[in-house]
């Protein structure tokens, strides 16, 4: 799993892949809820919790999702047994030395593309800048 973020260069947005160096999937801290509208319709909602960016992400964006360390995922998911203070302590930037980022092709700007090319490192040709 990786995430995309767009770095601003002047008036241009450059898509980037941000991921763990080991390329392993990772868990994000989030919250979910199920509630009913006044008309009785069931609504399922969720949010991904963000935090201040680490040094890798800071030049790209002013926040980042909370990426959970593998050993912390079960504690986050078991709210009934994890004290609030412990859960809150997990809401911190992921160590930048375990992550990397690189430019990717502008094809990621279109939802119609779903290929490995979307995460491959990309170098913009001078004429494309």
Please give the residue ranges for each predicted region:
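A structured binding-face within diverse protein domains that lines the active/interaction site
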Residues: 1-129
